[in-house]
Amino acid sequence: MNRNPKIFGRKCEIREITNKDIVYEFLDKNHIQGRTGFTIALGAYCQNNLVGVMTFKKEKEGYWDLNRFATDINHQCIGIGGKLFKHFVRNYPFIEIKSFADRRWTTDTDNNLYTKLGFEFDSYVPPTYWYYNPKINPYIRFHKFGFRKQHLHKQYGLPLTMTEREMTTALGYTRIWDCGLIKYVYK
């Protein structure tokens, strides 16, 4: 049984957060994947304390990506996701909002936060690989995009005759695979 104090979304005030450091600190503390880049960050405040954050990244005009949602890990935050999302929908013009759920944590495509917010299942995204380096931080995954051969050659002087995997191994990185994603769309 969860013994953390309850906070209800209906008692929260929603505000746009313009200070990225506040958003990054909150996400690093309360989201399993930590911070990410964003265009708009909305905060849920209860008695002037930040208890929830939802971030959106503008892909192109009218197309958005809901890329992070987190609540204070020391509280049961009920209804805050819905309140933050409704605020975005009411106040920011959009054609489509997409979001991706990690299949390690989201298995039911019909009964989860996305469907409760009005998103519809779009597709499964196949598994892909990431890198991590236990000497740097064993808990942080690095996206494969930063490990392209040309990039590693330019940054570290590694010969282009090596494969990406050989280059990353030489640099102390290990390749790990995820379970894929579930893509949701809100129109």
For each feature predicted by the language model, list its residue ranges:
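Helix N-terminus capping/helix-initiation residues
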Residues: 18-19, 102, 141-143, 161-163
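A conserved beta-strand-loop-helix scaffold within acyl/acetyltransferase catalytic domains
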Residues: 4-92, 101-112, 116-117, 121, ...
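Flexible loop/N-cap segments at domain edges
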Residues: 97
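Helix-centered, glycine/charged polyanion-binding patches within enzymatic domains
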Residues: 119-120, 124-154, 160-161
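Alpha-helix termini
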Residues: 92-94, 131
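A conserved mid-domain beta-alpha-beta active-site/ligand-binding segment of alpha/beta enzyme cores
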Residues: 146-184
